[in-house]
Amino acid sequence: MDEHRSRTPSIDSRNYAIPEADYLPAGIDIDRNGVSESDDSSDDDAQSSLFPTESSGTLWMNQIQDTPMFDSSKFLFESVNNAINDIDFSESLAIQAKTSALINSKSRELKGLIKQLQEKVDYYNERFKRGAVVSSQLKVNLQMLSKRIATLDDLFSKQFPIEYNQSKEKVMERTLND
């Protein structure tokens, strides 16, 4: 039951390549350097009709046929195999995963800190507004009390001048001693 599978592709694309002999008539052979005549000699007009000039755009087909066939399935298999087995590839994936996790973690941490900061800003903003209202009320109360004290001071200084001056002197002595 232990089967060992081949690591080579199951289909060889070279099996399906059309041989060069099928392209040409029987009287002409192709070698790597170009066109040569076989035993059956033909005139130059016949050769020129089979192989058009460069300006006709078909010369490139002859040049392509001279190059070896490209095995795309082998190339694809080797590319995938190298990519999967390559240690650098797995290390880069691991580093990328760690970096992504770190960025995600820091992003969540920053979002939490921003939320806490916003809550504190809202809290202190509300306290400042209440403090502004309280301070304006205190200012009004202090102004009203200073007017009452000034009124009482005038009233006591006129109705009880002797007692008023004695108490004023005691207060002055107390502040000088301290």
UniProtKB/Swiss-Prot annotation:
Pfam families: KxDL. Residues 37-46 have a biased composition (Acidic residues). GO terms for cellular component: BLOC-1 complex; endosome. Keywords: Coiled coil, Endosome, Transport. Component of the biogenesis of lysosome-related organelles complex-1 (BLOC-1). Belongs to the KXD1 family. This is Biogenesis of lysosome-related organelles complex 1 subunit KXD1. The lineage of its organism: Eukaryota, Fungi, Dikarya, Ascomycota, Saccharomycotina. The gene is KXD1.
